[in-house]
Amino acid sequence: MSRGLGDVYKRQVVNNKLKDADRVTIVTLGGTGHEPAISGFVGEGMVDISVAGNVFAAPGPQACIEAIKMADKGHGVLFVVLNHAGDMLTGNLTMKQVKKLGLNVIKVVTQEDIANAPRSNADDRRGLVGCVPLYKIAGAAAAAGKSLEEVAAVAQKFADNMATIA
């Protein structure tokens, strides 16, 4: 394990203040290769755990399940997934398993890239840099003591109304 602003485990970067978290926590996932995304956004008021895959590849669901279990401090976990095929597959499989485990998790998907598809066809839009302000907004709501449902609602409203172009 490496220490700094975040602790680094095999494929997880963990906010080193997570152990003291008395709030909703935020977990995200993504492939490596575009640093500082996604692991570079771990820190106070942002992401609590980032799960990294190989270069340009999503991590497996088991790593995400372990991260969610580690992040869960009794207030629930917001699971942010960017709309890319591998990330979505991992995100959906992860959600299926954490629900079976009885964990309180809500998934929010970023799919804001308007270069791919119009708003009416959001499922075909990629999640890109819009995740960064979403992490900050959700992190601020969590830090303010909002419930998981409230944090997720704020994050979802932002996700539904943002657009980027790449």
Model regions and ranges:
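Single conserved hydrophobic/aromatic residue that forms the stacking wall/gate
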Residues: 1-5, 9
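Gly-rich Lys/Arg/Thr-decorated short loops/hinges at beta-loop-alpha junctions or inter-strand turns
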Residues: 20-29, 38-51, 115-118
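Short glycine-rich or small-residue beta-strand-to-loop segments that form or flank ligand, phosphate
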Residues: 24-31, 47-50, 76-85, 92-95, ...
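Glycine-rich oxoanion-binding loops at beta->alpha junctions
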Residues: 34, 38-74
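Short acidic, glycine/serine/threonine-rich loops at helix termini
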Residues: 37-41, 89-94, 117-124, 163
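Short, acidic/small-residue loops that bind anionic groups at enzyme active sites
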Residues: 50-55, 99-124, 130
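A structural-propensity feature for long, helix-poor, extended segments
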Residues: 58-83, 89, 117-136
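Internal, active-site/partner-interface "lid" segment
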Residues: 116-126, 133-166
